[in-house]
From Swiss-Prot:
HAMAP family according to UniProt: RecF
Name recorded for this polypeptide: DNA replication and repair protein RecF
Function: The RecF protein is involved in DNA metabolism; it is required for DNA replication and normal SOS inducibility. RecF binds preferentially to single-stranded, linear DNA. It also seems to bind ATP.
Gene Ontology molecular function terms on file: ATP binding; ATP hydrolysis activity; single-stranded DNA binding
Amino acid sequence: MYIRSLELRDFRSWPELKVELKPGITIFIGRNGFGKTNIVEAIGYLAHLSSHRVSTDAPLVRANAGDARISAVAVNQGRELAAHLLIKPHAANQGQINRTRVKSPRELLGVIKTVLFAPEDLALVRGEPAERRRYLDDIIATRRPRMAGVKADYDKVLKQRNALLKTATIALRRGYGTEEGAAALATLDTWDGQLARLGAEVMAARFALVQDLSSQIRDAYQTIAPESRPAAVNYKTTIDQGLAQFGEFDAGIIEATLLTELAAKRQREIERGMSLVGPHRDDLELHLGGQPAKGFASHGETWSFALSMRIAEFNLLRSDGTDPILILDDVFSELDAGRREKLVGIARDAEQVIITAAVSDDLPANLADAITARHTVTVRDTDAGRISLLDEQPDTQP
């Protein structure tokens, strides 16, 4: 798979961008703050419907613009598809495939497949469980786009259930002794059933993915850092003890176990006003030689683990039959010679690679002969603010 053309309108610092791309390695060079990362962020957003830098859409829309637009034409095994996304910070986003508007932007998932490695990926190792859950859920949605809808439905149910636990605490505590309490508990029972059903689907998909990823991550880490301790991953849930008796993780068993645990934790949840059971509290545990990577990994080991997770993601998507687009956002300057060499080897073998760097000297020397296109990102200060430009010199006039 590769992107043949990319167009942006009012996306961050880009009032307009039109660029033709080819298979092979494309480089975007520009000083920090000039807007090169905004280009790859847009591609990643079109692929995953989320940014690797921010959690809301508002920062993606250029100042004083009402919305932003991302358009790309992707070529997959000779077939072209055009994906368009209109980002509205104060309304629902709109998606389009070729000339047909889709009911939900989630229908764009899978049209463009990317794996993005960026300095922010250190949070996969050092950050909170939410970072690692998102890592799993993004891969699942890329491979099985329907699951993005399941996850979105789960999040809605979770929000409603938490709202009930917070706002109806007194009624829930009174229980069936009052009409108000009985009604609140009946509503909670309804949310429990939906939380368990949808949560079981999410967790079953994560279990299956981790089973596929674990050996890939282990082998990638061993290749990147052969002198280090062995890497391992484990999906930890809030119902591990209940699942242990079954030894398998299909959705039916998970749903029944979730319902049992929800019943056991009900009083605690009412007292605390929050949902304590479900995939929203799970984690992908990372280990090095039996110790948690978070807190025990050195800086170099942290980079190696994060990189191995992205390599595993790339290899897994490739095994599904399509090379994802590999995006390397300003990472070569952060890596030592050994890790740079491993990454160059992967880049040379991928169908399309998009790399950003502050200066050409940040790029490994053994990458030069494989580069198919090189672009320069500059800026210009205007009355409407600073804007990014591609392959132009900045305006030096007062």
